[in-house]
Amino acid sequence: MIRYLTSGESHGPALTAIVDGLPAGIDITQNDIDSQLLRRQQGYGRGGRMTIESDKAEVMSGIRFGKSIGSPITLLIRNRDWENWTTTMARFEEPVEEIAKISIPRPGHADLAGRIKYGFNDIRPVIERSSARETAARVAAGSLSRVFLKALGIEIGSYVSAIGSAAEPTVNPAVEELLVNGAECLALEADRSSVRMLNKSAEAGAIAAIDEVKKQGDTLGGIIEIFITGVPMGLGSYVQHDRRLDAMLVSALMSIQAIKGAEIGHAFENSRKPGSQVHDEFFLSENTGLERKTNRAGGLEGSMSSGQTIHLRAAMKPISSLVTPLHSFDLETMKPTLSRFERSDTCAVPAAGVVAEAVVAPVIANALLEKLGGDHFIEIKSRLETYRDHLHRTFKA
């Protein structure tokens, strides 16, 4: 089982991730990790932090001569901004008097509940760990599972379908055309846009909307669509709640900072229709075996992969740190005041898509390992080929 933990504060010396359970024998390059970190830093509407950081992962363990060796992989990403925070984020020194305590929580953020939960007299520790800066470590960690999956013919990609009210067409033929060549083809096309949109009109509308809210000191959220191609039928299980693949994928998406909703396939649209207009019918073909003409279920049925492309959707709220303040109060004086501003992005929806790709990768990798077993890439690949051949023969009978 692949599992990972991240550590580090937004303005501490570094972020770290320890990835345990990755099989041995997987070819991994430095670029496999750093290219994903670079993608995360892109996107129209990002804040000043992205001009400071240039994220690179230092591999401290678990890889030898370009291959995973089965032991925990430790990744370290240094924070260049740390040099400006050595006093505020000092680890052992006594706090100096000029460091002001933060006592005014921002609505929509972890500030208030985090301060109360952990008994702090300063909101700063909450801000540091709840920050989406942490996702850099998760993108690095997820890149390892992503490499593993791609070597087995499974690809992950995403694009942004809406930022604010600027939205892609509900039916976009370009998506299906790109997915024919794998989900990474879709992601590469999306990456050509500064807002990771496929439709030029929607892209222009999103950029204009970001510019407008930035002038107003406001922020924007949006919707990201995630696709996973090449997943064989039968991953996950209906037998127990904690083995349901749909639940694990949605949980992974909901773990991303500022994600407030997740959907599989056309779930909410399907809820308004009769079953005869929702369920994806089976058709048998002498040439290809089992066929389906629709994928409204998003590649998941009965909590298991159906063999179709997995389609997920996630909704990101507008970022909680606003230049134009909202009503708040001071925890020290218990008097009303306006909320404070912490350096942030105007819109981080494009980056959230990259993070979403990263967090679903270990989920799919674990479902595959649960089905196939194995400790070395070669034996896992052999078992997957055998299983795929079995599926092919089953539906060609």
From Swiss-Prot:
PROSITE patterns found in the cross-reference section: CHORISMATE_SYNTHASE_1, CHORISMATE_SYNTHASE_2
Cofactor: record remark: Reduced FMN (FMNH(2)).
Pfam families: Chorismate_synt
GO MF annotation terms: chorismate synthase activity; FMN binding
Keywords per UniProt: Amino-acid biosynthesis, Aromatic amino acid biosynthesis, FAD, Flavoprotein, FMN, Lyase, NADP
Catalytic activity: 5-O-(1-carboxyvinyl)-3-phosphoshikimate = chorismate + phosphate
Disulfide bonds: none
Residues engaged in binding NADP(+): R40, R46
UniProt entry tagged with the keyword Flavoprotein: yes
One Gene Ontology CC term in the entry: cytosol
E.C. number: 4.2.3.5
Stored SUPFAM superfamilies: Chorismate synthase, AroC
Pathways involved: Metabolic intermediate biosynthesis; chorismate biosynthesis; chorismate from D-erythrose 4-phosphate and phosphoenolpyruvate: step 7/7
Single biological process term from Gene Ontology: chorismate biosynthetic process
Cofactor section: FMNH2
Binding residues for FMN: R129, S130, S131, Q257, A258, G302, K317, P318, I319, S320, S321, R343
Function per UniProt: This reaction introduces a second double bond into the aromatic ring system.
Annotated family: Belongs to the chorismate synthase family.
Cross-referenced NCBIfam families: aroC (TIGR00033), PRK05382.1 (NF003793)
HAMAP family documented for this protein: Chorismate_synth
Subunit text: Homotetramer.
Protein name stated in the entry: Chorismate synthase
